[in-house]
């Protein structure tokens, strides 16, 4: 076991905080100092000094040039798949719930997702699971 304790480790810890200036434009500097109290007999103490400076942020542009219009936001694409809560029938033949009806829990709007439609059923399958993901062409809305 190590013979040092947290008290001796904390005895060589010093934090120097910068003086608070009234001006916001002055850069701030912080200093953190660690020293080891193990080798008090030698003059070559191992130590770690960390300095961090925070520069003032450049002022934001407040005025726009004349004739320059703000960029128009792109219109959202229409949502894909059935809406949440819609009753759907499963068309995947290998599914436990084939031709069964369940309700849509969520639809992933990413077009690269293979099975974006999450459907929840009232009955559970052999693994005690009541939800499954399906592709858009594997479900049809029930009216």
Swiss-Prot record:
Stabilizes the interaction between PsaC and the PSI core, assists the docking of the ferredoxin to PSI and interacts with ferredoxin-NADP oxidoreductase. InterPro entries: Elect_transpt_acc-like_dom_sf, PSI_PsaE. It is found in: Plastid, Chloroplast thylakoid membrane. It holds the Pfam family PSI_PsaE. 2 isoforms exists (ratio 1:1). With or without the N-terminal alanine. It comes from the Eukaryota. This is Photosystem I reaction center subunit IV B, chloroplastic. Keywords: Chloroplast, Membrane, Photosynthesis, Photosystem I, Plastid, Thylakoid, Transit peptide. The lineage of its organism: Eukaryota, Viridiplantae, Streptophyta, Embryophyta, Tracheophyta. GO terms for biological process: photosynthesis. Residues 56-86 are annotated as: Disordered. It is a peripheral membrane protein. GO terms for cellular component: chloroplast thylakoid membrane; photosystem I reaction center. Gene3D superfamilies: 2.30.30.50. Belongs to the PsaE family. Its main location: plastid. The keyword Lipid biosynthesis does not apply. Residues 1-51 form a transit peptide. It comes from Nicotiana sylvestris.
């Amino acid at each position: 076991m190590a013979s040092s304790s947290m008290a001796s480790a904390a005895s060589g810890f010093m934090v120097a905080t910068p003086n608070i200036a009234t001006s916001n434009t002055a850069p701030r500097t912080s200093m953190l100092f660690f020293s080891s109290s193990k080798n008090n007999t030698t003059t070559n103490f191992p130590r770690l000094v960390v300095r961090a400076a925070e520069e003032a942020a450049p002022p934001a542009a407040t005025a726009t040039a004349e004739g320059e219009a703000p960029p128009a936001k792109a219109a959202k694409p229409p949502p894909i798949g059935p809406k949440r809560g819609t009753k759907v029938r499963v068309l995947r033949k290998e599914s436990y719930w084939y031709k069964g009806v369940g309700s849509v829990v969520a639809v992933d709007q990413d077009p690269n997702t293979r099975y974006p439609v999450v459907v929840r059923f009232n009955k559970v399958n052999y693994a005690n699971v009541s939800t499954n993901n399906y592709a858009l062409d594997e479900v049809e809305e029930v009216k």
